[in-house]
Design a protein with these regions (language model features):
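N-terminal signal-anchor module of multipass membrane proteins
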Residues: 2-12
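Conserved phosphate/anionic-ligand binding catalytic regions in large, soluble enzymes, centered on
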Residues: 10-25, 225-243, 285-292
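Alpha-helical support elements that line or immediately flank enzyme active sites
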Residues: 19-32, 241-252, 298-305
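A glycine-rich helix N-cap at a beta->alpha junction
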Residues: 61-72
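C-terminal regulatory domains involved in ligand/effector binding and gene-expression control
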Residues: 70-200, 210
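Accessory "access/gating" subregions that flank catalytic or transport cores
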Residues: 169-252, 257-270, 274-280
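Hydrophobic alpha-helical bundle architecture
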Residues: 264, 272-342, 355-359
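Conserved small/polar residues in nucleotide/adenosyl-binding loops
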Residues: 360-365
Length: 365
């Protein structure tokens, strides 16, 4: 299993599979064909069906168009066998195709084809299921974040510090930005309004309202094409930051503990990515917001003193109640129902944490 560095990525929204992946593919293709006279890019399946709303064409054209004229072709009715997010890049010179390259955006900004990943990450974790890692924790007397540290090395904390700083900056920007989101649905930003109202409520209601505001802040920034952290994807990027920011602010948790919780969240997200999928186009929103909720629940449970068994149970519960959730955004925009779904998932993550902590009293349970 690869590093959590491959899961947490700092990028522009609104979609890791529909913008980050295609842009990365365009950059790789351009590096091989800087002398091309023109380019032709064909989008298939989900990329073509929702690409306009996800700004897929804008991401690709921002790379290729400055070098040579680029034609975009949309084929939503054609789904290539390997994955719904298929792309065909063609470089033309003298009226002839120099290279035709079929590639797929498989979620979280990652690329793959039928044969191999474009840049095969180094597998650093020997265990690839939570069941195995839980047994390791019990045998070693350690918990999940220590498993991450053992195999990632101490420099993982510097990386996670950058990730956490970016998450906080995104929330703070989102809380201050107002107005209508781009795309034509005329969806107004709500994070700042929720935050103002939260300050007038009693402690319990205020805390939950702030949680919603934090999740909305990141999700609205994502919808506007702002900088977010994939956790595990752009479309689900509001859940983990909201939960951690809420706990950090309300309980004055030191940063070092937040980073450890983030490591645990990354581990659980990585497990889902390795054994299943975090691509909404491939497995629906259960693989995006569902996995994000599990990541956040695991992180929260750790911060509240949960044992490895309780942490695992919180993550399991958080994910299983999102099973079957589809990815069917209105007009292909990462706005309805995506934004409010992040807020609901953040609340559900804290509910799963509480439920798990009440159910189990020891790791022997």
């Amino acid at each position: 299993m690869e590093s959590i560095r491959e899961l947490f990525r700092i990028c522009n929204g609104p979609s890791s599979s529909h913008t980050v992946g295609p842009k990365k593919a365009a950059e790789q293709f351009l590096a091989r064909h800087r002398d091309a006279e023109s380019f032709r890019v064909t989008l298939y399946g989900s990329l073509a069906a929702t690409g306009k709303g996800h700004l897929t064409d804008a991401a690709i054209l921002s790379v290729l168009e400055p070098v040579a004229p680029t034609e975009m072709i949309w084929k939503p009715e054609t789904v290539l066998p390997f994955h719904p997010n298929g792309m065909l890049y063609e470089a033309l010179k003298g009226g002839k195709v120099e290279e035709a390259w079929t590639i797929f955006s498989v979620g979280g900004g990652a690329l793959a084809n039928e044969h191999t990943k474009q840049r095969k990450p180094v597998d650093i974790y020997p265990l690839t299921t939570i069941e195995e890692i839980l047994k390791w924790c019990q045998a070693e007397g350690k918990t999940f974040w220590e498993y991450v540290e053992d195999y990632e090395g101490h420099d993982i904390w510097e990386f996670l510090s950058t990730i956490w700083t970016t998450m906080c900056e995104t929330i703070e920007r989102g809380l201050n930005n107002e107005g209508v989101l781009p795309g034509g649905l005329k969806v107004r930003r709500k994070a700042s309004t929720y935050m103002v109202k939260a300050k007038s409520f009693n402690d319990s209601l205020s805390s939950r309202s702030k949680l919603y505001a934090y999740a909305l802040a990141t999700s609205e920034e994502n919808a506007a094409g702002g900088i977010v952290v994939t956790a595990p994807t752009c479309g689900s990027s509001g859940v983990v930051p909201a939960v951690l920011y809420n706990i950090a602010q309300s309980r004055e948790i030191p940063t070092v503990r937040i980073l450890r919780a983030l490591a645990t969240a990354g581990l659980f997200g990585n497990i889902a990515k390795t054994n299943a999928s975090i691509s909404g186009a491939e497995v629906g929103c259960q693989g995006e917001v569902g996995v994000a909720c599990a990541m956040a629940a695991a992180a929260a449970c750790q911060l509240f003193g949960g044992t490895p068994t309780q942490i695992e149970y919180a993550a399991e519960m958080a994910l299983e109640h999102f099973l079957g959730l589809t990815c069917d955004p209105v007009c292909g925009l990462v706005q309805i129902p995506c934004i409010e779904r992040n807020a609901v998932a953040a609340a559900r993550a804290l509910d799963a944490n509480l439920y798990a902590c009440l159910l189990y009293t020891s790791d022997a349970a």
